[in-house]
Amino acid sequence: MMQQYQSNSYLFGGNAPYVEELYEAYLQNPASVPDNWRAYFDAMQNVPAVDGSNGRDIPHAPIVASFAERAKQGPIRTIVASADSDMGRKRVAATQLIAAYRNIGSHWADLDPLKRQERPPLPDLDPAFYGFSEADLDIVFNASNTYFGKESMSLRELLNNLRETYCGTIGFEFMYVSDQAQKRWWQERLETTRSKPVFTLEKKKHILDRLTAAEGLERFLHTKYVGQKRFSLEGGESFIAAMDELIQHAGSKGVQEIVIGMAHRGRLNVLVNTLGKMPADLFAEFEGKHVDDLPAGDVKYHKGFSSDVSTEGGPVHLSLAFNPSHLEIVNPVVEGSAKARQERRGEVGHKEVLPVQVHGDAAFAGQGVVMETLNLAQTRGYGTGGSMHIVINNQIGFTTSDPRDARSTLYCTDVVKMIEAPVLHVNGDDPEAVVYAMQLAVDFRMEFKKDVVVDIICFRKLGHNEQDTPAVTQPLMYKKIAQHPGTRKLYADKLAAQNLVPAEFGDEKVKAYRAAMDAGKHTADPVLSNFKNKFAVDWMPFLNRKWTDAADTAVPVTELKRLAERITTTPETLKLHPLVEKVVKDRANMGRGDQPLDWGMGEHLAFASLVSSGYPVRITGQDAGRGTFTHRHAVLHDQARERWDAGSYVPLQNVSENQAPFTVIDSVLSEEAVLGFEYGYSAAEPNALVIWEAQFGDFVNGAQVVIDQFISSGEVKWGRASGLTLMLPHGYEGQGPEHSSARIERFLQLCADHNMQVCQPTTPAQIFHLLRRQMIRLFRKPLVIMTPKSLLRNKDAVSPLSDLAKGHFETVIPDHEELNASKVKRVIMCSGKVYYDLVNTRKEREANDTAVIRLEQLYPFPHKAVAAELKKYPNATEIVWCQDEPQNQGAWFFVQHYIMENMTDGQKLGYAGRPASASPAVGYYAKHNEQQKALLEAAFAKLKGFVLTK
């Protein structure tokens, strides 16, 4: 079935323009199209138009073409239509033939270096399909709708030009692009050159040099470090020539910084031959020697690197992102890193910073994060002015090489059609075509600020890794590969056969490279060793910091009032919704000290004070502007707006004249790509408060790979710091298993080595101080905040303005009731919303012998603060940990041993909370209330079940 689908060229959505041109031909002359299409189009004429009319469709193509022709000819002249209807049909057929080659010429291009299959005949590309005979090949047709350089030419010449342009060793896909200017750009660039580059001898020698380097490194490592994993590039050596051309050509176009993301295949080759890592340093890693002293470290083919190289346009900074083995997950990280670098450069950022994504064919088609990341490409909050995509298409994914198993599309790149990115499929055995394709791709990206893909079809000489035996599952493929002499040799022989270089030239290059390897010298030339980039970030102030470092987060009352006045002042022409108008009015009262602050105002004053002090703030999420629970209202909407794209006002962008940027983005509906993007942004910009907010905390596990592989472990593996802040709405309020829990236990399980902070603040003053602490304290670690839902409007969860003008973030909040400490027999420790339920229950029960302590920071665990609070109650014999979550979830299993460390001999530790559950929460509201009542009673009742004694 899939083969039938692929064999019918009309059924591909990407070929819709081809069908449209066929329909245009039908409207001009129904007899000019095949019978089956004529019957289909005849039936369409009976379908009423959108306006209900039954008139016959009118062809647009002749009208458009006539205007184009008139523009070329200058003064209008009268053209007499031919009376020869057969000739008229042939003219239309010639136009159809041109359209067919532009649309599906890539299907017949010479792309596979292994030539495993004969190229099947495509009727659509055969003149006979359109009714042409052999005798018709010498008929001269108007060719003004092409860029072949002639106003007219014979059908034979036209056909040769089309085949040379669209069916050579590069196959082009661009006709699905909606923008006519982009389509014309491609047609002109390809047809004027017949898709053939004209390179100087020096350029050709340089290409051979890069192929020699690519092959030489792999062969050196293969013989010196036998059997060690390196994920060889052999079979895809043209990729190194492509990378070289990308960097050099982009540099000549004004690019000053390139951020690269790629998986393991060929990574070591890029490190040495593209970025200029010293071979001696790589060899040391193969031998188990490590320059860095990281708590965990990582394997060599995950490591990143940065360098500066010289190009015609000036120095270019190269940054290869660190990444895990989870394929394609680095894509959004690279985009976020590029975005941060672009914004540092201002308006020219898109021109000067270029993101480059290197993919494998199987992963590009198979991993969902690819689609999520592509969807960011043209959005306001995440667009980076177009990314360069290179596919190392070795036609196999581990052991899967049959397209019937690898994907459901013709090409592995078909996913990019969703954003109308053009694709250049190129035969890896034609290095000049690969380099030329890269030139075209760079030019397109710089011209149109859109993504573009270069798909290098090659092969994988060895197994998935060097310990694999691929012939076990791919015997036919690996027979072909065994007979292949290698791209370098093919190209060297070609240059020698053309008498461009001596016969021994290629072998001499091989020997020279081997000598450089033996000496451990640079092989990427020229690498700049002392270039200082003025846009580089200095991470030195953030090194060797402790979470206990002091941070003055208080803001004077006079400044708070000024900020409050600024963020509650709106333009007179702005008509607010009555509900929002009340929010703004209440915030003005809060700013004057006339009423206590709610959560939204605590956040706003934190943001306002930061941007006013020069710290940029970026907050993104699916409802970041308004807030999932309508508490934030960072973006105010004019109810009288007359245009959909106008009429909004952001008070936090109008705090002071020289303030830092405040950016709030309602994100696309994605967790994985958006969180990956924000991690990448934060890792490149330590001086900005970067926040990602989940719609509900429950949905954060849609980005679990980012949390596991980057946020929690990036520093101990790679030494990469990040101050990313996650806001995860969390709380048990009877909304069921999908809207209750941010899975706090999973974050706590990942905590070690002081790798991140997990906090659950319960007052507006606490969130104010916590957000400010994240910037003011020079300690850049991810911050995970379990934010409230019902507390956003809880009359007890408020703070006076004065609490923002004094104090700091309290990791532990003591009991504020006036208790007789000597009479306290039980101390209840808790975190989050349940605190308010507990104090209300205590009041109802008049349990004056019970103290309630709030743990606002769960990790790093605040031992000193906890110990100090417990010491206040010398006669307490029982400690109870109370939580909303089930026993196997929440913080219980994480905090119990920390609490035990701070207990005195003889004290007992008990648990009060929901029983263990496979689901985060019950779905029945009545059962939720029943459980909530039971856990509150258990917090004050006799200890039962699992009790620990110090």
UniProtKB/Swiss-Prot annotation:
GO terms for biological process: glycolytic process; tricarboxylic acid cycle. Signal peptide: none annotated. It catalyses: N(6)-[(R)-lipoyl]-L-lysyl-[protein] + 2-oxoglutarate + H(+) = N(6)-[(R)-S(8)-succinyldihydrolipoyl]-L-lysyl-[protein] + CO2. Its EC number is 1.2.4.2. Coiled coil: none annotated. Keywords: Glycolysis, Oxidoreductase, Thiamine pyrophosphate. One of its GO terms (molecular function) is thiamine pyrophosphate binding. CDD domains: TPP_E1_OGDC_like (cd02016). It is an enzyme of class 1 (oxidoreductase). It comes from the Bacteria. One of its GO terms (cellular component) is cytosol. Its cofactor is thiamine diphosphate. The keyword Oxidoreductase applies. E1 component of the 2-oxoglutarate dehydrogenase (OGDH) complex which catalyzes the decarboxylation of 2-oxoglutarate, the first step in the conversion of 2-oxoglutarate to succinyl-CoA and CO(2). Homodimer. Part of the 2-oxoglutarate dehydrogenase (OGDH) complex composed of E1 (2-oxoglutarate dehydrogenase), E2 (dihydrolipoamide succinyltransferase) and E3 (dihydrolipoamide dehydrogenase); the complex contains multiple copies of the three enzymatic components (E1, E2 and E3). Belongs to the alpha-ketoglutarate dehydrogenase family. This is 2-oxoglutarate dehydrogenase E1 component. It comes from Cupriavidus necator (strain ATCC 17699 / DSM 428 / KCTC 22496 / NCIMB 10442 / H16 / Stanier 337) (Ralstonia eutropha). The gene is odhA.
